[in-house]
Amino acid sequence: MESKSEQNEWSSGVWAHLTAVRQQSPLVQCITNFVSMDLVANTLLSAGASPAMVHSVVEIPDFTPHIHALCVNVGTLTPDWLPSMKAAAELASQLRKPWVLDPAAVSCSGFRLKACLELIELKPTVIKGNGSEIIALSSASRGQTKGADSSHESTDAIEAAKSLAMSSGAVVAVSGAVDIVTDGKQVIGVHNGTKMMQQITATGCSLAGLIVAFLAIDSSRVLEATVSAMAVFGIAGELGEAMANGPASLRMHLIDCLYGLDETTVLKRVNVTRLG
């Protein structure tokens, strides 16, 4: 159980990160999937960041050096897109720009698993997935997944996430009923969010994009920036659900609530605990 002072510290940190994103409007390159581009871009815009959905391998050498951070999502991976992902990730790492890997449905094919393992070799700052994705990626074995949804709770994946963090050097974020963030030693739980968010496609992809924006303004505190992004997205979902009639209207309210988040609401609603 967190002490009140620790909880206040998390809450003030979350607000500070969101304020910095709004003030600095970091340029975030997203090489993401066809399904998620719209929601990812609008999530980033509503948080105050500047999204760029640039994915052509021809443009990487010219464009990527100018970004503040990179998001790579393999949701609709093809052999044509993989070189772009690798080129951008390699350049981001060389230039010490933070980047996030979202290994969507990583175990659905050998091609996808191999691609994600190759991307991990390029040193992502954060690896963000659901429980099944993190378990499959951690063991580098083919598991049974249900599309990009998760058949494992996030808490089931804690040990796999810690192992993956230690082997990859990345902070690992596991989305679920309780979001888990670990650097291999510390384990933080983010208890914000709502179940209905799982009924909207691309919310996980959008969360990865938001994490990238927060890393762009605080790359020296990767775990804390990741926790802040997950808390902010969860709070926006909670507020949105209170106004929504179902998933379609929640999608709209999620973006509006993220855009309108104020200090009082954030400080009151952040629910973060240390799990280990």
From Swiss-Prot:
Q: Does the keyword Metal-binding apply?
A: yes
Task: Please give one Pfam family short name.
Answer: HK
Q: List the disulfide bonds.
A: none
Offer an example of a GO molecular function term for this protein.
magnesium ion binding
Q: What induces it?
A: Not regulated by thiamine or 4-methyl-5-(2-phosphonooxyethyl)thiazole.
Gene Ontology biological process terms, A to Z? thiamine biosynthetic process; thiamine diphosphate biosynthetic process; thiamine salvage
Q: In which pathway does it act?
A: Cofactor biosynthesis; thiamine diphosphate biosynthesis; 4-methyl-5-(2-phosphoethyl)-thiazole from 5-(2-hydroxyethyl)-4-methylthiazole: step 1/1
Which cofactors are named for this entry? Mg(2+)
Give yes or no: UniProt keyword Metal-binding: yes
What happens in the null mutant? Answer: No visible phenotype.
Q: State the source organism's domain of life.
A: Eukaryota
Q: Where does substrate bind?
A: 53, 202
Give the keywords, sorted: ATP-binding, Kinase, Magnesium, Metal-binding, Nucleotide-binding, Thiamine biosynthesis, Transferase
Catalyzed reactions: 5-(2-hydroxyethyl)-4-methylthiazole + ATP = 4-methyl-5-(2-phosphooxyethyl)-thiazole + ADP + H(+)
The UniProt function text for this chain reads:
Thiazole kinase involved in thiamine salvage pathway.
What is the designated name of this protein? Hydroxyethylthiazole kinase
Q: Which organism is it from?
A: Arabidopsis thaliana
Phylogenetic lineage: Eukaryota, Viridiplantae, Streptophyta, Embryophyta, Tracheophyta
Q: Which gene encodes it?
A: THIM
